[in-house]
Amino acid sequence: MKRRDFSAQLLGTGLGVGLGAAGMAAAPAAFAQAGPVEGKDYIRLSQPQAVAPGKIEVVDFFWYGCPHCFAFEPSLDAWAKKLPTDVAFRRVPVSFRDEPFGTHARIFYALESLGQVDAMHRKVFSAIHNERAALAKPDEVSAFMTKNGLDGAKFLEVMNSFSVQTKARQAKQITDAYKIDGVPALGIQGRYYTSGSVAGSNDRALAVADQLILRARKG
């Protein structure tokens, strides 16, 4: 979903779930022969971003309110679990507008701080897209977390903490540095990014990401 599309598809407007183009099963074999093409399959950052030494960084840029991110999550999660040990995978929630992006970013970082991402990440997606829960107001967030076995009041405290707000601001800086204009998108080693809209489909973007990881490993 492109940045410009978000204003027309905010929460509570009956977001549909779709992934755009699909059926690119031949992509991995083609890439193995020729490699992905800059400008067609991926974008090279004009200003590379610093990454932690020792591992190849892969960043999942997402928004809980994005139907494409929700549909992509099972494939992405399965792919991420099979990444080599020298690859570090992390998620970064985007903030293309003030709200509800800011609230959703802080939900993610509060879950991360509490060690609940694995348990709750897909539940947040499902609540928004299957149950039409906006999760944009404190009472909604608290009730949802309580319903799912967490202390709702404590969650709001963590969500509004300085550390979580700092991480949310840093996430916006990372998103801007990568010049992400739509999600889902994948950043590779601070040098490249790809997405379904760039590569042709989200499955094809994963194949491109595999090749960019190989490229980053070579230096």
Residue ranges and their predicted role:
Residues S75-A78, R106, K123, E140, ...:
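Alpha-helical elements of Rossmann-like donor-binding domains used by nucleotide-donor carbohydrate transfer enzymes
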Residues K2-D98, L214-G219:
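Extracytoplasmic thiol/disulfide redox context detector
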Residues D5, K147-G219:
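C-terminal cap of thioredoxin/glutaredoxin-like
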Residues L83-T146:
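Structural microenvironment flanking redox-active thiols in thiol-disulfide oxidoreductases
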Residues K55, G65-F72, R97-H104, S113, ...:
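Solvent-exposed, acidic/flexible segments
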Residues G65, F70, A80-L83, L111-G115, ...:
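Sec/Tat-exported extracytoplasmic proteins
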